[in-house]
């Protein structure tokens, strides 16, 4: 899995490409988010528009990172979810835990 990141209007944006199914790909995303939080990032948008599928290992990383960001007083927002990814969050009842946005721009612009 390739993961890109950049800063837009002071907000860190991370965009993984592929599937969050565990293993080294999921570890790469987990490490990147941990590194951003350690560098003092206060707002991170995880753009999941090119994430084709998320399994329990991928959900575990999202939950772990949401907790880490929450404990640090930082925000982790999910944006641009595919229907499959959103279905997984809805079925697992995690869509109510995460701040989910229709687009990356909406997540960046939101002050919630």
Predicted regions and their residues:
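Amphipathic alpha-helical interaction surfaces in cytosolic regulatory modules
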Residues: 20-98
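Acidic phosphotransfer microenvironment of two-component signaling modules
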Residues: 83, 105-106
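Short beta-strand/loop segment at the start of cytosolic alpha/beta domains
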Residues: 1-15
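Residue-level detector of flexible, active-site-proximal loop/helix-junction positions
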Residues: 12, 20, 105
């Amino acid at each position: 899995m390739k993961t890109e990141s950049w800063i837009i209007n002071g907000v860190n944006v991370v965009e993984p490409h592929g599937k969050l199914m565990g293993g080294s790909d999921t570890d790469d995303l987990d490490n990147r988010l941990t590194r951003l939080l350690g560098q003092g990032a206060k707002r991170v948008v995880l753009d999941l528009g090119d994430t084709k599928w998320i399994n329990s290992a991928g959900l575990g990383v999202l939950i772990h990172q949401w907790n880490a960001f929450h404990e640090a007083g930082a925000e982790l927002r999910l944006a641009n979810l595919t229907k499959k990814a959103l279905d997984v969050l809805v079925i697992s009842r995690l869509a109510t835990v995460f701040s989910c946005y229709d687009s990356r721009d909406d997540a960046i612009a939101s002050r919630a």
